[in-house]
């Protein structure tokens, strides 16, 4: 391929498709980005959880956090709690907090934990976030700037509402072209690269 790419087609919507289209359009505004999705393929999933990296992704495509939270029924996610991780005893659990322990790059926290407090949970010894979660506290305060964090966080959200929210943002603010159609054929060039798509109603 020697010609510069000027047009990109994203096949498939949902959160993955619209995030891909949004990032391409936001970071490469000279490109013509089109998303093609079928009306006959429903969005999978209702609830969805993200890693903290989603905050950076939303920032990169120009989304305000308050708009995202209110329109996608989002709540903060500070980690994962695994119930009965080792056995079936009542109350036994394992926390995987999103906040990195302070100094983890410069010391062997595991060895220190085993020496100082082996009878306590690792997350409780090296990190405050499990206690924040157990107290049902948020990872930030109302006055904390959007996407900033006191403790690291991702989100729980409604996947269907998130996809619709992303679609509206990408089409209205990032000039992504939206085509609803079924793809019938993928056409490759002489080198095996995808050259074009054929659809039922748009050629």
Question: What are these language model-derived features?
Answer:
Residues 3-14:
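Beta1/beta-strand and adjacent pyrophosphate-binding region of the FAD-binding site
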Residues 42, 46-135:
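Dinucleotide-binding Rossmann-like beta1-alpha1 core, especially the glycine-rich loop
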Residues 25-46:
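Glycine-rich FAD pyrophosphate-binding loop
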Residues 149-169, 178-181:
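Short beta-strand to alpha-helix junction loop
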Residues 177-196:
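A conserved short coil-to-beta-strand element within the FAD-binding core of flavoproteins
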Residues 200-203:
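Core beta-strand elements of the Rossmann-like FAD/NAD(P) dinucleotide-binding domain
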Residues 20-31, 57-60, 173:
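A short, Lys/Arg-enriched amphipathic alpha-helix followed by its capping loop at the start of a domain
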Residues 17:
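N-terminal Rossmann-fold NAD(P) dinucleotide-binding loop
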